Amino acid sequence: MIKKRIIPCLDVKDGRVVKGVQFKGLRDIGDPVALAAYYNAELADELVFLDISRTENGHQMMLDIIEETASKLFIPLTIGGGISSTDDISTLLKHGADKVSLNSSALRNPSLVKEASEKFGSQCICIAVDAKWEDERNDWFCYTHGGKQPTDIRVLDWVRQVEYLGAGELLVTSMDYDGVKQGFDHQLLNQINTVVSIPVIASGGGGNAQHFVDLFQQTNVSAGLAASIFHDKETTIGAVKTYLKDKGVDVRWH
């Protein structure tokens, strides 16, 4: 059986790590390189950087951060945010990224998923899905631009399509659960797992170690991603992994 992974996520804006609740109200958390080194020592299985900078200067700072971070990490580094071409992907990989996460650009141009997976390999291409339940339309829909822009694309249709186009992994964020620390969106995740066979990383709602136990016992996702509880030192990745192991969940130990 594949061991379950715990992944911290760092939202980086203009060179600083920030965090909000349900994609709003950003607050400063700290220096990305220092936090990455901390999580590397804390037994994180991977690290995700999402570049939410709005400026060219912010994106350039991100490349410097990736390069410095990659030189200090012994775990895979995934970069997302503002990636719109295979040239962008190539630049990130050259600066030290192991994987890239595509979201808005893939929804805008699905052929990018196929082109990128063929050029760099499926294992390199993760599709980030910001999913929100809409009562009026009775389904989950994809959102873009950091959760600000609704689309008419149903989540289940989209994940099927990107798997077919060659994506190697999904990073699924439940916008309804994001940052509120009440547990993961099992219903959404189980629906996705019924229509795809590629690994799914669950994001949005992790508030304590029991939430990760519930996630891995009640869904078939391969990893759980969180930010708030780790950034705020409410618990550590090591403590979560120990708790998971005690509850019979097979986790990675480095």
From Swiss-Prot:
Pfam family, any one: His_biosynth
Lyase keyword on record: yes
Alphabetized GO MF terms: imidazoleglycerol-phosphate synthase activity; lyase activity
GO biological process: L-histidine biosynthetic process
Keyword entries, A-Z: Amino-acid biosynthesis, Cytoplasm, Histidine biosynthesis, Lyase
Keyword Cytoplasm part of the UniProt annotation: yes
Pathway: Amino-acid biosynthesis; L-histidine biosynthesis; L-histidine from 5-phospho-alpha-D-ribose 1-diphosphate: step 5/9
Subcellular location: Cytoplasm
Domain of life: Bacteria
InterPro entries, sorted: Aldolase_TIM, His_biosynth, HisF, IGPS_HisA/HisF, RibuloseP-bd_barrel
Main EC class the enzyme belongs to: lyase
Known catalytic reactions: 5-[(5-phospho-1-deoxy-D-ribulos-1-ylimino)methylamino]-1-(5-phospho-beta-D-ribosyl)imidazole-4-carboxamide + L-glutamine = D-erythro-1-(imidazol-4-yl)glycerol 3-phosphate + 5-amino-1-(5-phospho-beta-D-ribosyl)imidazole-4-carboxamide + L-glutamate + H(+)
Main location class: cytoplasm
Enzyme active site: D11, D130
EC number: 4.3.2.10
SUPFAM superfamilies for the chain: Ribulose-phoshate binding barrel
NCBIfam families: hisF
Subunit-structure text: Heterodimer of HisH and HisF.
Entry-linked PANTHER family: IMIDAZOLE GLYCEROL PHOSPHATE SYNTHASE HISHF (PTHR21235:SF2), IMIDAZOLE GLYCEROL PHOSPHATE SYNTHASE SUBUNIT HISF/H IGP SYNTHASE SUBUNIT HISF/H (PTHR21235)
Family: Belongs to the HisA/HisF family.
Protein name listed in UniProt: Imidazole glycerol phosphate synthase subunit HisF
Lineage, highest ranks first: Bacteria, Bacillati, Bacillota, Bacilli, Bacillales
